């Protein structure tokens, strides 16, 4: 059931306004995508969809989802460029089974009916980054860990800055849940989608875990 003035009832534009975020002023056609890197490379497909926290982009290769982000302009352009470089191909507008499954599962996450994701992922990065991203996916729904705890779990307590950097390089929001990592003192720290969204996601998971799947706008 839709609760008036709750995020589920707000359009992306309304949420951005309520959260004090700038309006989205672009679509997929606004981005400058690079040239095809090889004659036989398969393009990455990019699909834009709406969520209770505003528009999101999902990118997928033939292997799986390689990007899932809130629409935040400069960060998106930087990540698109990096993704094209890493996969030696270009991004074009389109959908495949992976983008459709990701959109469906994210919708279920926001509805409070999904806590684990099944969509295939394709995460190009360094060995250390992939290790950090794998560890992020082991953080239980509704829980949080500090950067120090994350480094400890990786067996490298001194690697806090490196861990934070790998978290920041994560291109798959929510599914690879970097929003569950907080400061040692419990404070919210940087999040590519903005601290308002990070707070919302954490509160949403707590409410769902406690049996209340009707989120309130902060």
Task: Outline where the language-model segments fall.
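Major-groove DNA-recognition helix of helix-turn-helix-type DNA-binding domains
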Residues: 171-175
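Major-groove recognition helix of helix-turn-helix-like DNA-binding domains
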Residues: 163-169
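Short cysteine clusters
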Residues: 178
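…primarily DNA-binding HTH/wHTH and HhH modules…
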Residues: 184-218
């Amino acid at each position: 059931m839709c609760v008036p003035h709750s995020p589920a009832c707000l359009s992306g534009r309304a949420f951005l306004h309520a959260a004090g975020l700038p309006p989205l002023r672009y679509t997929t056609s606004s981005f400058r995508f690079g040239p095809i890197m090889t004659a036989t490379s398969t393009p990455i497909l990019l699909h834009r969809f709406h969520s209770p926290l505003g528009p999101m982009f999902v990118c997928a290769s033939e292997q799986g989802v390689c990007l899932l982000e809130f629409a935040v302009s400069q960060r998106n352009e930087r990540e698109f460029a990096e993704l094209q470089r890493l996969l030696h191909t270009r991004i074009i507008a389109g959908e495949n089974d992976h983008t459709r499954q990701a959109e469906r599962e994210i919708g279920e996450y926001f509805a409070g009916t999904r806590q684990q994701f099944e969509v295939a992922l394709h995460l190009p990065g360094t060995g250390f980054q992939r290790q950090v991203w794998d560890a992020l996916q082991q953080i239980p729904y509704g829980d949080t860990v500090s950067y120090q705890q994350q480094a400890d779990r990786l067996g490298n307590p001194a690697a806090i800055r490196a861990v934070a950097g790998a978290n920041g390089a994560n291109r798959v929001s929510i599914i690879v849940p970097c929003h569950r990592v907080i400061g040692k003192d419990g404070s919210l720290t940087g999040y590519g989608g903005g601290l308002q969204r990070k707070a919302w996601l954490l509160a949403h998971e707590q409410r769902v875990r406690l049996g209340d799947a009707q989120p309130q706008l902060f």
